[in-house]
Amino acid sequence: MKKAFRVLFSFLLLLASLGVFISNKVMFLKKKDDEEIFNRETEAGHLVPDEYDALPKREVTIPSSFGYALKAVLVEPHDTNRYIIIAHGVTQSKTNSVKYMNLFLNRGFNAVIYDHRRHGESGGKTTSYGYYEKFDLQSVVNWLRKEKGPDLLLGIHGESMGAATLLLYAGMLEDGADFYVADCPFSDFSEQLAYRIKEEVKLLPPKLLLPVANLFVRIRDKYSLSEVSPIAVIENIKNPILFIHSRMDDFILPSMTEALFEQKQGPKKLFMAENGLHAQSYSQNRDQYEKVLDEFLEEYVFAGDGIVAAD
């Protein structure tokens, strides 16, 4: 009897230890150093410091509904009501968003780039892969509309976690932008976490570890993994979405974006890039990326509003 109790106790202790370990990985995933991001982006030609410094812009602080500050940059080289909000991926910062910002500046948009909670200069203690981040995105949208007025042509571009965040925002809170660009999102966080566990934690099966991880995330960060599921809410998004993914992505599988595209009703477009790994669709397929973006904007955004594209 005592031996059976010891075995049970040891097993429960192991599960608890794994629960703490995995929930720590989820909530406190190691972020990339700001200098590392800056150097990578400048070396790739995505960010030219002199050109960025010359842009008319101002740093702004946007209050999150959870009590911390979201640090953002409002970039306004154009006299226009067109604005794009850029949401970066997990472990990154708004510096990573500059390359996407430039795409839209070149197409006549002004832009807001911002740091997610617990990233860059923003506050917040944990990363939730879109659960809390969707409310922060709503705060950014509300701030921009209050600052510039309600009559905006507004788009949101997101990469990886940022893409999942914009889909959760649009599908769960409000379809508050005129269009969206979702670059390499996951379709369901539980499935994504199970896949990463299978790839990285080979000792125990995901079916055993996922419920433990979910329990500890619920206890420690007050949400369930099942509540971070863009595919469960994609049907609520009526405005146009451009879905983008690299066929070679082995971190978030391209089949997730394909499933989101199939589930989305109404105006949509899909670009499966031939080159690059995760979040490299633009850097490894620049000409095609820009061509597809232009086609999407012409077909679903500018044409619908009688707007002529900027030269």
Annotated model-derived regions:
Residues Y100, P230, N239, L253-E262:
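Short alpha-helix in the alpha/beta-hydrolase fold that links the catalytic acid
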Residues M101-G123:
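Conserved alpha/beta-hydrolase
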Residues K148-S160:
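Alpha/beta-hydrolase fold nucleophile elbow
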Residues T127-K148:
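Alpha/beta-hydrolase active-site loop
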Residues L168-Y223:
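Hydrolase active-site cap/lid region
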Residues N236-K238, F243-H245, D249:
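Short beta-strand/loop motif that positions the catalytic acidic residue
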Residues Q284-D311:
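Catalytic active-site module of serine/aspartate enzymes centered on a nucleophile-bearing elbow/loop
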Residues A4-P63, V73:
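An N-terminal hydrophobic leader/cap segment in hydrolases
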